[in-house]
Amino acid sequence: QDKPFWSPPIYPH
């Protein structure tokens, strides 16, 4: 697990 999830889920529209 080398993927630090610090950014919130972004949904491009």
Swiss-Prot record:
Tell me which Gene Ontology terms the entry assigns under biological process.
defense response
One Gene Ontology cellular component: extracellular region
> Is Cell division found in the keyword set?
no
Q: Which InterPro entries match?
A: Tryptophillin
Q: What tissues contain this protein?
A: Expressed by the skin glands.
Q: Does the keyword Protein biosynthesis apply?
A: no
Q: Which residues carry this modification: Pyrrolidone carboxylic acid?
A: 1
- Which UniProt keywords are given for this protein, alphabetically ordered? Amphibian defense peptide, Pyrrolidone carboxylic acid, Secreted
Q: Which family does it belong to?
A: Belongs to the frog skin active peptide (FSAP) family. Tryptophillin subfamily.
What is the recorded name of this protein?
Answer: Tryptophyllin-T3-2
What organism is recorded for this protein? Answer: Phasmahyla jandaia
